[in-house]
Amino acid sequence: MGLMDLVKKAFLGATDEENRKNKEKMRAIFNESVPNGNDYKLIYCHMENFSNAVIVENTKHSNFIVGYKEGEVVVIPVNPDLLDYGKAIIFNKKNESATRTSMGYCIVSNPEISFQFVPITYEPALAGKGKYSVAVTQSSAEVSEFKNFFKKGL
């Protein structure tokens, strides 16, 4: 890893090589989990849930591959190194799902389950979150398109 890669890793959360490899892994996971996976646009989302006890603060980090196309959203929970992942959860009108945005969060839900997450452009390793997030960078345009999709609704 050269000096420029170290700088990118520190400030953007991913080197160009990590970004490329992780986006390929995300696509492979998605295509393995969802029929016709290439029909969906993909984005990485992260969520932190905080809980406070009297003395201890606990933070739970969650990572998701989110695929979306007109009328449907698919959420796949993943771990930060993309080695383990959960079952694909499909949201569409048939299962009474809805999407919305609120205070920077994207929310998808149906009567049985709901997810709230944040699509991120990058997660700086300097912030200490590198070990909890997938090392990937996404453009502001990608994130904006995703948020607009959620605002519009299914």
Language model segments and positions:
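Polar low-complexity intrinsically disordered regions enriched in Ser/Thr and small residues
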Residues: 40, 70, 107, 131-133
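Terminal and domain-flanking low-complexity segments
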Residues: 126-154
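Coil-to-alpha-helix initiation sites in intrinsically disordered, low-complexity, charged segments
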Residues: 1-2, 78, 144, 148
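Phosphoinositide-binding peripheral membrane targeting modules
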Residues: 53-114, 121-123, 149, 154
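Anionic N-terminal interaction surfaces
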Residues: 2-66
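Non-catalytic effector/regulatory segments
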Residues: 111, 115-117, 128, 132
